[in-house]
Amino acid sequence: MRLRFTKMHGLGNDFVMIDAISQKVTITPERARKLADRHFGVGCDQVLVVESPDNPDADFRYRIFNNDGSEVENCGNGARCFAVFVRQRQLTAKSDIVVETAAGLLRLHVLDDNQVTVNMGVPVLAPAQIPFVTPHEQPEYPLQLDNMEITISAVSMGNPHAVTLVDNLASFPVKTLGAQIETHAQFPNRVNAGFMELISRQEVKLRVFERGVGETLACGTGACAAVVSGIVRGLLDTTVAVHLPGGSLSITWEGAEKPVMMTGPAKAVFHGQVKL
């Protein structure tokens, strides 16, 4: 069969979008891996699938496959693309969209110029729920890598994140240390590794080594986790501009039991068909 798809990106974090409602298709991990292959497939960081929801409170089900075929709980940049995609495909005319994910419900609000605000939910700091193996919850934790010890914060935004403060982000060995953090034994489900440089209380730079993907141009959940970690440490204000290699996001968090709000762009690049 021929599969219709749309290529989209959120700040360079790129996606193959699949409408599995108007075309009957099942995306398996193997199919996702082939679609995501940049040499032999379409090529992307993640494959995002629109399905009919099981939850009656949701408009759609939102599934996320990394380019290694693994299915994950959440993707913030993908959520913005998802909201724009379902409107462009005329699957809905709503500007407020509720989607069902493996991590729960996400609420998306489409603004002008394809800017989207995503209610990313309340961040989780309890180690057992991230999951992160440690005796007690703390703002910071030591983490022993191959040849050094670093300090991290551990946050779940529906998916696990370890955030490290660095002095010079441009020269920091993100790929080397990111790979060690991703597969660290204290994170039983692996982890996304974020590296944050503070500019001011309202502005940071961030690079993210994503679980199952590697370093990407942008990571929405990573930006949220980084801001939460900075606020918990007393280093950041409630609204922060996060500058990623692919562009900038605005992240707001008003503290414990409050949801994190993320605003940023989503853009369609091209439409196509591929033989499965």
UniProtKB/Swiss-Prot annotation:
Entry annotation: catalytic residues: 75 (proton donor), 219 (proton acceptor)
Any one GO CC term of the record: cytosol
Protein name: Diaminopimelate epimerase
NCBIfam families hit by this protein: DapF (TIGR00652)
GO biological process: lysine biosynthetic process via diaminopimelate
Primary localisation category: cytoplasm
Source species taxonomy: Bacteria, Pseudomonadati, Pseudomonadota, Gammaproteobacteria, Cellvibrionales
GO molecular function: diaminopimelate epimerase activity
Domain of life of the native organism: Bacteria
Job of this protein: Catalyzes the stereoinversion of LL-2,6-diaminopimelate (L,L-DAP) to meso-diaminopimelate (meso-DAP), a precursor of L-lysine and an essential component of the bacterial peptidoglycan.
